[in-house]
Design a protein with these regions (language model features):
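AMP-binding/adenylate-forming catalytic core of the ANL superfamily
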Residues: 85, 91-92, 102-106, 243, ...
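Conserved AMP-binding/adenylate-forming core of the ANL superfamily
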Residues: 8, 18-61, 65-69, 86-91, ...
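Structural core segment of the AMP-binding/adenylate-forming
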Residues: 45-46, 69, 73-142, 456-458
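Conserved AMP-binding/adenylation subdomain of ANL enzymes
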Residues: 184-202, 210-250, 264
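Conserved structural elements of the adenylate-forming
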Residues: 33-39, 145, 176-198, 206, ...
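Gly/Ser/Thr-rich phosphate-binding loop
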Residues: 223, 248-252, 264-326, 339
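A short helix-loop-beta submotif of the ANL/AMP-binding
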Residues: 52-53, 59-79, 83-87, 92-101, ...
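Conserved pre-ATP/AMP-binding loop-to-beta segment of ANL
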Residues: 15-16, 146-165, 172, 196-202
């Protein structure tokens, strides 16, 4: 299969059906196909070759949807850029992937001078916004208007579809290599459950489209010929109004968004009866919030999807029926396309109910990490993806995720690795030692918490630490709380005992 396959099917069967709604713009499948063919033609005229990486740094838009289709149409490879990153992180991903073309919208156009300086090999910038085209950039609509349409390359199968960057423990992100087959297997397997996308669905995109979770919902909706209503980002009032006005049937949300929506003072004033499917995942959710959400959206079935970028991204699904059976703390059972096990450190399966590392196998598992053979070898062993997550299975095959073995913190749906934050915190002149852990947070699922040992006589307010950290890494990774400690608990081998730090807060 290939990523553009759903578009071809829809053009054949329903060319006049609306595919995308973004603000005042509505475009049919037929119109989108024509624009995609011309945008692909423009990319080829710009000397974009087979397998070349094309990046996009943009808030959600209908043009983002066209980018996702035009790049493979042109026989190139996607590189969706995390919009929450700092300039050094963005520049690293562009250099590491050797992306020579960057699409950028109005929001991020001001970063272009810094990015051009940091990425000297960036040959072409395409302005995909509605405002004035920046100096040195090409206009998105101008390119489409001038280019001749080209035939779809039908790039697919095991060929590389995209390099999707995820957080890294060394201070820089890792590029996950996913093929067309990887993504198609995940989309089809998820859709087969009846929980992610249905024929004729109207899917709302308010979660970031650079994120593989929303991309999976986009792909499943595309394969089934559904329509996409696209918001630039998450605003609770706008989300509620959009669901009501466009009769949205499906939406993907992270738990932080769910809590904000159910807390909205006008949530009961909107007609939300069209909403039949709410898919959530990407971070922990409390049972209390989930129960409130099920009351706020009484017509909707709730589905949890667990996985990671390396799994394209779905591994397990907690279906609507499972929610009714009182298993709200479970991450569900293996999706139709996945095989899931829990193992001990030696790779042997552990008995049901015993915590171990979650490993996953299937056609959706990544090819590896871009330019990182050592990390690839560590993650992919004997055909299994070692997730680094701790959990256990019950006797019915339901998975329960209990911890992040690799100290990953999930805050507001975004992955944060403690080592990355520690590296940034430690660069402050007042810091002698530090450790970073995740603590439960009612708004963010988890929050980044720093335990800091200061140099003698030094002081460090939290606000100063946050500002310092945000100059080095993305703002959402900066500590939201901090403790000044006399010393850190250290093991006999010199390692910080983070379990002791967590235990302190658990026992409060």
């Amino acid at each position: 299969m290939y990523l553009t396959q759903g578009l071809h099917r829809a053009v054949q069967q329903q060319p006049d059906q609306v595919m995308t709604i973004c603000g005042d713009r509505e475009r049919t499948f037929g119109e989108v196909a024509g624009r995609v063919a011309r945008l692909a033609g423009a990319l080829r005229e710009l000397n974009t070759g087979a397998g070349d990486r094309v990046a996009m740094l943009s808030l959600n838009s209908d043009r983002y949807s066209e980018y996702l289709l035009a790049v493979p149409w042109a026989d190139a490879v996607l590189n969706p850029v995390n919009v929450r990153w700092s300039v050094p992180e963005i520049a690293y991903s562009l250099r590491d992937s050797d992306s020579r073309v960057l699409l950028v919208d109005d929001t991020f156009a001001p970063l272009l001078p810094a990015l051009r300086e940091a990425v000297p090999d960036l040959a072409t910038v395409i302005h995909a916004g509605d405002g004035p085209v920046p100096d040195g950039a090409l206009g998105y609509e101008d390119l489409i208007a001038a280019a001749d349409p080209v035939s779809d390359s039908r790039r697919g199968g095991d060929e590389l579809a995209g390099v999707f960057y995820t957080g890294g423990t060394t201070g820089f992100p890792k590029g996950v290599m996913l093929s067309h087959a990887n993504l198609a297997v995940s989309w089809l397997g998820s859709a087969a459950t009846g929980c992610l996308g249905t024929s004729g669905s109207i899917t709302l995109h308010t979660a970031p489209m650079f994120h593989l979770a929303d991309l999976a919902y986009w792909g499943a909706t595309l394969l089934l010929g559904g329509s996409h209503v696209i918001l630039p980002g998450f605003d609770p009032g706008t989300v509620l109004a959009t669901i009501a006005s466009h009769r949205v049937t499906d939406v993907l949300l992270v738990p932080t968004m769910i809590q904000i929506l159910v807390d909205h003072p006008q949530v009961t004033e909107y007609d939300l009866t069209s909403l039949t499917s709410v898919v959530y995942g990407a971070s922990p959710i409390t049972q209390a919030v989930l129960e409130r959400a099920m009351k706020a959206f009484p017509s909707a079935g709730f589905t949890q999807a667990y996985g990671m970028t390396e799994l394209s991204p779905v591994a397990t699904i907690l279906t609507r029926a499972d929610h009714e059976q009182g298993r709200l703390r479970s991450a569900g059972r293996a999706a139709p396309h996945a095989e899931v096990r829990v193992v001990d450190p030696d790779g042997a399966a552990v008995p049901n109910g015993t915590v171990g590392e979650i490993i996953v196998r299937g056609g959706h598992v990544m090819a590896g990490y871009w330019n990182k053979p050592t990390e690839t070898q560590a993650a992919l062993r004997d055909g299994w993806m070692h997730t680094g997550d701790g959990g256990y299975l019950d006797d019915q095959g339901y998975l329960y995720v209990v911890d992040r073995i690799k100290d990953m913190i999930i805050t507001g749906g975004e992955n944060v690795y403690s080592a990355e934050v520690e590296n940034a915190v430690a660069r402050h002149r007042a810091v002698a030692q530090c450790a970073v852990i995740g603590l439960p947070d009612p708004d963010w699922g988890e929050r980044v918490h720093a335990v800091v040992v200061l140099h003698p006589g030094a002081t460090l307010p939290l606000a100063e630490l946050r500002e310092h950290t945000k100059t080095l890494i993305a703002g959402y990774k900066a500590p939201r709380s901090m403790e000044i400690a006399e010393a850190l608990p250290i093991s006999g081998t010199g390692k910080v005992l983070k379990r002791e730090l967590r235990k302190k807060y658990r026992d409060l």
